Amino acid sequence: MRLQSLANRVELSFVLNQLNYMAKSGRCSGVLAFGANILGIKPSLAIIDGELKVVRKYRGSLPICVGKYITDLLDGRDDIDNSMVFISSCQPKPGCMEAIKAGLRKYGKFENIIETNIGTTIGGYSGPGTIGIVFAKKV
């Protein structure tokens, strides 16, 4: 029961570096992936009501997009349990992990920042450079 309660409070989202792997797995069309990669669009996806949905789209280099992603994710929120946050990555680009840690520290919300690697199944769909943030909301 306690685990189910926690699962309902967990918020998970991530930013993809490229859409090639999503297209190869059939999660988006090849044309969409090609256009997004040409324009430098980095989508932010989240699990909402048990479904994977695009939340926002960012343009630019991944470290800059990650900074915007953190701002959009955390700015003005007071419903976050600040005991810990997980940063999950799949072969992150140079500078991305530092950018995400700096962004999290800027908001001063989290006591523990824990780095994890994305597993092979999710990494196979998302591809290298994917960065995700996982935290729990307050009860």
Predicted regions and their residues:
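Mixed-charge interfacial surface used for oligomerization/domain docking
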Residues: 1-139
